[in-house]
Amino acid sequence: MTTDQLPAELERVHMVGIGGAGMSGIARILLDRGGLVSGSDAKESRGIHALRARGAQIRIGHDASSLDLLPGGPTAVITTHAAIPKTNPELVEARRRGIPVILRPAVLAKLMDGRTTLMVTGTHGKTTTTSMLIVALQHCGRDPSFAVGGEMGEAGTNAHHGSGDCFVAEADESDGSLLEYTPDVAVVTNIETDHLDFYGSADAYVAVFDAFVERLAPGGALVVCVDDPGAAALARRTAELGIRVLRYGSGPHGQAPSGEPLAATLVSWQQQGTEAVAQIRLAGEQQHPLVMRLSVPGRHMALNALGALLAAIEIGAPTEAVLDGLAGFEGVRRRFELVGTAGGSAPSSTVRVFDDYAHHPTEIAATLAAVRTLLEQSGGGRSIAVFQPHLYSRTKAFAEEFGHALDAADEVFVLDVYGAREQPLAGVSGASVAEHVSVPVRYLPDFSAAAEQVAAAAAPGDVIVTMGAGDVTLLGPEIVTALRVRANRGAPGALR
């Protein structure tokens, strides 16, 4: 049975860092469920403007007095330990007043109470797979509540309080917070070592997925992509615990590489421009393969969709309706998102600029593979990768792997490291990545000059893709503008 009644401690909350992707989503749901919300953040943003329009009281900057934005003060203060230091004056004041300080994952878990919970995790593809599942269920008339790490194209938001009986959310593995949840269905897209700054070792990182799956509700199921070795190993360990496992992938004859039957098989996949058509087969169905159409390119996207399909079917959604919903999925912001074009109308006479959140070597490889297929189908042109490493610790750990992944482009520009919450590490910079790239590469430590230099390298038919989890996303529009300026003045080197 679902209810809109909020737990007493969440009826009036103050949120420190309210503008972040995860925090703003929680704020939306609390407001939609009748809660009173105040908050603070370091700077204005579109998300903060949207929350104010919904009734949230938000102050820019951090000060102890912000806890008085709500009449009577908050019943709880919500924060995220990854981004907000314990010395934040609002957190210090909350502790002084005896106001409970609750971390975002614990709040999300409380908001899921009473609903069938579907959660997606994995090293890569979490946000896209979660969003695909949401869109599919919406198309089936389920109106799920949801919280996702990126802005969905269809909804224009990252969270929603729905009238349905299910809740779909992304489970972030980066800091172990996924262990707050007890899902009915867990989707694991892949497992590949990451976030060593938090876990310290690959074994510790892998272990958190086992712990998460062991938290499945009684009768729950693991939906897992066994094309990925790490996820396939998790599937075997989970099955040994007696937990139901639904495997998907592209193994021959409907079997995983290790011989287990697949619940869903990607029989074939073909990219058609920026769209794709896949042939899939579900276990126990002997008819011809089903057709799955997608509006997003890349084989990895087809596998993500297959995981979303299985999860939706698991809670009773009709297969054909789910496939129809997936066909209408428009993507997630910053997941191979077309930023703009410059030049003529035909692919051979224009430069297309895309932006992607890829910040791990495997994600870069998948994105550049999609670019390569796009170029092959449009008659040629070159791929130009613009990569901004994210976190000094990750750059140090994967500098060589980043370089090898970027070799799939024809030309590469490497920006300096976006440190986010980390302090610089001696000897670690964008140059650490660039020195491992074997195709033509330039290291651009001056972000302000990058757009013009990238634009100068482009020619008609080329595809430029900016990649990274930092502010490299701001560069795409600047590149498009620079390309158009060069075209209008007939500058050599671009759109010639």
From Swiss-Prot:
InterPro entries from the UniProt entry = Mur-like_cat_sf, Mur_ligase_C, Mur_ligase_C_dom_sf, Mur_ligase_cen, Mur_ligase_N, MurCDEF_pg_biosynth, UDP-N-AcMur_Ala_ligase_MurC
Top EC class for this record: ligase
Write the record's keywords in alphabetical order, separated by commas: ATP-binding, Cell cycle, Cell division, Cell shape, Cell wall biogenesis/degradation, Cytoplasm, Ligase, Nucleotide-binding, Peptidoglycan synthesis
Cite a single GO BP annotation. cell wall organization
User: A single GO CC term, please?
Assistant: cytoplasm
PANTHER family, from UniProt? Answer: UDP-N-ACETYLMURAMATE--L-ALANINE LIGASE, UDP-N-ACETYLMURAMATE--L-ALANINE LIGASE-RELATED
Q: Write down the HAMAP family for this protein, in alphabetical order.
A: MurC
Write the protein's name.
Answer: UDP-N-acetylmuramate--L-alanine ligase
Species for this entry: Mycobacterium avium (strain 104)
Gene name per UniProt? murC
